[in-house]
Design a protein with these regions (language model features):
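Hydrophobic helical h-region of N-terminal Sec-dependent signal peptides
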Residues: 13-18
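Terminus-proximal functional modules
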Residues: 26-213
Length: 213
């Protein structure tokens, strides 16, 4: 992901990365914050407290959600995400967090990771019912990864309805996209992932706000 002409200093945590391009994320605006947010960071993250960028890399998605939340509690927000093989052929999820000194909102992140697209759609909808907004998606081996966020300071929750489309044929995806947008859904993101039974699968996520009860 391009970070502009003036690129702030960055601190890299985990393995060094060769040839990884970070995908851009849509912006919108969430786990329980520790009493002292800064104290939740690791020693190396604490040393990076004056830097604008933080790079997180892990093979476990559960670890990534925890580290993202710790960074968010210290004032960072999601800037980019990519899943892939790093230097030694290990599948890793890589996330870049960026500090925004002007932001005063408290953000909670939720990371979803599933092999089955049907399971992902169910988990997406549970997150949408809780007011989580789509931020980004990628793939990691045969897993589809989606990151959502919500502002913990909001007094009321805007529920979101999500729709996940998955097909091996792009022509079929075009037809399903047209039908979804005609029903009021807005495009959120798309990835090409390894299918559970081999081959590639196009995975597209759309959303629309829930109105009424």
């Amino acid at each position: 992901m391009a970070l502009g002409a003036h690129q702030p200093s960055a601190v890299i945590l985990g393995v060094s990365l060769l040839g990884l391009t970070l995908s851009s994320c849509s912006s919108s605006g969430i786990s329980t914050a520790p009493e002292d947010p800064a104290s939740a960071l690791s020693a190396s993250q604490q040393a990076a407290a004056d830097h604008n960028l933080l790079l997180l890399a892990t093979v476990r998605t559960s670890t990534m959600q925890r580290e993202m939340q710790q960074a968010a509690d210290a004032g960072y927000s999601l800037a980019g995400i990519q899943g892939g093989k790093t230097a030694w052929g290990t599948w890793e999820l890589v996330v870049v967090m960026q500090r925004n000194s002007d932001s005063t909102s408290r953000t909670e992140y939720r990371l979803l990771a599933t092999i089955k697209t049907s399971t992902m759609e169910e988990e997406l909808q549970r997150a949408g019912n809780a007011g989580f907004l789509y931020r980004a998606q990628t793939s990691l081996d045969k897993e589809t990864i989606v990151i959502l966020e919500r502002n913990r300071d909001l007094e009321s929750i805007q529920r979101i309805e999500y729709k996940l489309l998955a097909t091996t044929k792009t022509s079929t995806m075009q037809q399903e996209l047209l039908a979804a947008t005609a029903a009021g859904f807005n495009f959120a993101g798309v990835t090409v992932a390894e299918h559970l039974f081999g081959g590639k699968e196009v995975v597209t996520i759309l959303s629309r706000p829930v109105t009424g009860n």
